[in-house]
Amino acid sequence: MGIDFLFILKALIIAIVEGLTEFVPVSSTGHMILVGDLIHFNTQSGGFPEMYEVVIQLGAILAVVVLYWRKISSSVVEFLSYIFSFIGLKTSGDKRKYEKRLAESETGFRFGINVIIGTIPAAILGLLFHDEIKEYLFSTKTVAIGFIVGGILLIVIENNFRKRAKRSKIVKDIDKMTYGQSLLVGCFQCLSLWPGMSRSASTIMGGWISGLSTTVATEFTFFLAIPAMVGASGLDLFKFDYSQMNATNWISLILGFIVAFIVSLVVIDKFINYLKKKPMRVFAIYRVFAGIVLAILIFTKVIS
């Protein structure tokens, strides 16, 4: 069987969509479902389109790792150093040495704990209801509703946040986050299990409500994406039957991963710079408009 170049082109379009939307509050999964339906990418049997979307999401996550490598690597080192120093403090006679190491590595340890806490709620919910979420929530209808609901929530919560920020203290340093704030953000991340809601929108809204600045909430969203998406992707990749893969599938997979990675690199940098100057309202308005248009297309049976 020859290589299907049209299918590869469709796959690359989906990868570009993923890279453009993964880290902005518009729902990458919702857009991939919508665009995939429009270009008939989702019609291939055997579950390849779903597995492909999982792989290109990992490409997007790699972009976060590359851009924030210094913070990630130093935090991992400090996290492990804190654990070993704590053990040493309890078992060794040289307490002064280990107390010093504990103090030096406390920032990285707290950051690591915050990421773990923020990951737990969605991880539990995703594991418990993985099959039900895939079966009942992955459709254009639920995406349309998610677009609109998420857009309205973004407008309401951001307006409330900006009023509150004028009269109360806002956390502007990611290392100053409390465990309670990370838990609240993690609970909001559960909303992202609904395609169309957007993981970044959900966690940023949680950050606003918990008292984080927009930049801190967004950066914490990036870090939460690593364990959340690697875990979810690992489960899907483990269940996939690779015996059905052909040359077209493998080429699509490799190129899609690379394209999603490159596009995400650009988008993350631009998005952070945008947020330092302007509000999220434009994304919220786009979501509501896109949701209404999608609902009309579904109602008129232009798409299913």
Swiss-Prot record:
Keyword set, alphabetical order: Antibiotic resistance, Cell membrane, Cell shape, Cell wall biogenesis/degradation, Hydrolase, Membrane, Peptidoglycan synthesis, Transmembrane, Transmembrane helix
GO CC, alphabetical: plasma membrane
TM region(s), chain numbering: 5-25, 47-67, 72-92, 111-131, 137-157, 209-231, 248-268, 283-303
GO molecular function: undecaprenyl-diphosphatase activity
Domain of life: Bacteria
EC number: 3.6.1.27
Alphabetical list of InterPro entries matching this protein: UppP (IPR003824)
Catalytic activity, as annotated: di-trans,octa-cis-undecaprenyl diphosphate + H2O = di-trans,octa-cis-undecaprenyl phosphate + phosphate + H(+)
Subcellular location: Cell membrane
Functional description taken from the UniProt entry: Catalyzes the dephosphorylation of undecaprenyl diphosphate (UPP). Confers resistance to bacitracin.
Similarity annotation: Belongs to the UppP family.
Miscellaneous notes: Bacitracin is thought to be involved in the inhibition of peptidoglycan synthesis by sequestering undecaprenyl diphosphate, thereby reducing the pool of lipid carrier available.
PANTHER family in UniProt: UNDECAPRENYL-DIPHOSPHATASE
Protein name as catalogued: Undecaprenyl-diphosphatase
Gene that produces this protein: uppP
